[in-house]
């Protein structure tokens, strides 16, 4: 896992040199665990919801499209992400807690439909590819490692859609507020039990233009 993390950092930092904007995002994930078994419908005997932290650092590369009314209102972003997908549940007899942390690479296209010197409003669509960095489940006072659970580990792909508002902080700096919705798919889970993370994400960010 350390080798994967180091490789992602090298690739990301290597591209920053040639980019025009670098960004840092942090926020909250509000996640709902959806579980179903092969050949059946969704099975969630208990609501499994929770919140966790989200972090992303990356680069934004302008894409010039001649048919668009303004220059550089389409951007390609690539970033290294760290997301927590947590949940809690329980009944009269038992308490359940899941804590999981995933490291990944996120690619997205961001289109600014309102763009001025002071304000930038944009829609966003992309995909996050991640793998489990850490995870455990607690049932009452007993804790279990999730790293060997097929519904949690492996290759997780999460298509996402969102909105972003950005305003000028200085001549080359910006503050941003964003909302993203994603639903995960585990590409390597061949068991009968399937788990998806349905996540509403709120993020705050800062970005700087590089020349």
Which functions belong to the PLM regions below?
Residues 35-39, 150-151, 156-211:
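Predominantly the C-terminal beta-signal and adjacent terminal strand-loop region
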Residues 18-70, 209-211:
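Short glycine/proline- and aromatic-enriched beta-strand/turn motifs that initiate or cap beta-hairpins
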